[in-house]
Structure formats: C-alpha cells, structure tokens
Curated annotation (Swiss-Prot):
The modification Phosphothreonine is found at residue 99. The modification Phosphoserine is found at residue 100. GO terms for molecular function: RNA binding. This is THUMP domain-containing protein 1 homolog.
Length: 324
C-alpha cells in the first residue's frame, strides 16, 4: 500500500498537468469547408514559412487595401485636467465598502474584452493542415487571387521575393472535403465564375498528399467534363493554358482555385520569379557552345598533327627503301 502523502502528491500533480494543458496547448484553427486563403509550400522550417507568409501578405494587403484596423476598438478616454492642476489630485478616495463595485467593474470590462476578441476578424490567420511542409493562411478577403497576382507581378518586375523559406504561394478560392461529390459541387460553383462567358483554354494541375482515395485520372476526367459543360468552346491546352485549375488534396481536404496565366508565372514559385532560370540557361548555353567550339578546334589541330606525322613516317620509309 502506498502512503497517503504520496497519493496526495500524485493527485496534485495530475491536477496540475490537466490545468497546464489549458495554458500551454492553445486551440488550433483547422481547415473548414468554404474557407479561402493562400496555400504555401516549403522544404524546411514551417514556422519561418508561416512568418514569411504573414509578412508578405500583410505588406501587399496594406498597399492594396490599406492597413488593417481591428473592429470595435475601444476609444481611449483622456482624463480632464482641472483648473488647479492634475485631475487625479482632487478626486475623492473610494470608500472602504466600494471594493465589490470595483470587482464588478473589472469583471464586466474583462468580459467585454473577451467578447471583442472573439468577434474580431483577422485579415490573415494560419490554419493547421496536418501535412508536412504545407501551410494554409486563411483570409477574410473576398478575392485572394487578386492579391496573389499583385504579389507575383511585383516580384517578377522587381526581382525581390522577400522570402527565404516560402517556395510557392498559391491563392485558393474555396476549400471542400476530399470526396468526389463535394469536389464537383464546389468546382461547379467556381467554374460558373470562370468558364461560362467566353471560350478559353485550360489545364488541370492535380497534386495529392496523404490521400490515395482521389485518383488522378478520375478527377481530371470529371473536372474536364464539367468545364466543357459550361462552354463547349473551352479546350484543353497543357503547355500554354490561359486558365489553370489548381487541385491540391491534403489528407481529407481539397483546395480549389482557377488562376489566369499560372504557367507563365512559373506556377507561382517565388524563387523562380525572382531569379528566372532562363538567364542561367542562356548563360550555360553560351559557355557550352564556347567549350564545344574550343574542343572542335583542338580536335582539328590534333587531326592535322597526326596527318603530318603520318606523312613524315611515309617519307622516312621511302628513304630507307632507297638506301637499301
């Protein structure tokens, strides 16, 4: 039998650990149907990737839409100064029995602050994807694609990506559950916005992580049929599509978006936009051509020297035969 003192200590530790979870394990935001935002990928250091996403999105959102102002922000009241000096000097001291009123006021103020924080809507909020090296930033903006295009165009023109860990930053228009009925329903509403009016060329880009139920051929076939049903003039173009349908499946969730000139913009790869590989490839091609020309010149010189040596050998043979 264990002593009572030891049992009491164990009970206190268990109680302390249970209370500790409330403070040290904050409630995480998770993906939900109907959300929109930005899907980012990285190789290492997800925390740094999230921080860079916040910096990028807030920087360009402030440029486009202005700085973010919290809703229902309380106005700070400044104390009025009396004629004789500070306002606090002439205030009467609270009576001894007024402590309960002060406590009630503090509780009411704390409850009001909690209510304001719960009602406050942040412009960008990190959402847990439960997928390695995949980050999703939820947004309250109506059109995340417009902000994404502005970021990409600015990086392409200036050549400065302002990021080190973020590889791709793709705007997402809708989130749904990763099953075919929900995907077709969400895609149908989305395609009404992009494929109804004028015929265009399109391509489907599908990626899946930690999900084997959604098959590539199945989803591509059904989405292509859905696009053609919106407008018969829509055609598939895998190399130079004007509109790209982005389908990212993360475990039990599917992220959908339709983006113009996605392939021209290096698939929204920030590093590729800041440092285009075309320049590197052209430089490498010039160096390769120069080395090939040098090699060809050396080969010609070697061939000519070998021919001269052969002719010298033939002359020596003829002279020896004449001597004999």
């Amino acid at each position: 039998m264990e002593p009572a003192s030891k049992k009491s200590k164990m009970g206190k530790n268990v109680k302390f650990n249970n209370n500790k979870k409330k403070y040290f394990h904050a409630k995480r935001q998770t993906l939900q149907p109907g959300q929109r935002g930005f899907f980012a990928t990285c190789n290492i250091n997800e925390k740094a990737c999230v921080r860079e996403c916040y910096n990028l999105l807030n920087h360009y959102a402030d440029i486009l839409y202005g700085s973010e102002k919290p809703e229902n922000e309380p106005e700070k009241k400044q104390p009025e100064e009396g004629a004789g000096g500070d306002a606090g000097e002439d205030d009467p001291k609270p009576a001894a029995g007024g402590t309960s009123d002060d406590d009630d006021d503090l509780e009411a103020a704390a409850a009001k602050c909690r209510e304001m924080l719960s009602q406050r809507k942040m412009r960008f909020q990190n959402v847990d994807t439960n997928t390695t090296n995949c980050v999703f930033i939820r947004t309250q903006l109506e059109d995340p694609v417009a902000l994404g295009k502005h970021i990409i165009n600015d990086i392409a023109t200036t050549g400065k990506s302002m990021s080190r860990f973020v590889l791709r930053l793709v705007p997402i228009e809708v989130v749904c559950r990763a099953n075919m009925p929900d995907i077709i329903t969400a895609a149908g509403e989305l395609f009404d916005k992009h494929f109804l009016k004028e015929p265009t060329s399109y391509g489907i880009i599908f990626n899946h992580r930690y999900n084997q139920q959604i098959k590539r051929d199945q989803i591509i076939t059904q989405l292509a049929e859905l696009v053609n049903s919106k407008n018969v003039g829509n055609k598939v173009d895998l190399k130079e599509a004007k509109k790209s349908i982005i389908v990212e499946v993360l475990r039990g969730w599917c992220l959908l978006s339709v983006i113009d000139n996605y392939l021209e913009c290096k698939k929204f790869n920030l590093a590729e936009l800041a440092n285009p590989s075309d320049k590197k490839s052209s430089g490498e091609g010039d160096s390769k051509s120069e080395t090939s020309e040098v090699a060809n010149g050396n080969d010609k010189e070697q061939a000519e020297s070998s021919e001269e040596s052969k002719s010298n050998d033939d002359e020596n043979k003829d002279s020896t035969e004449n001597d004999k």
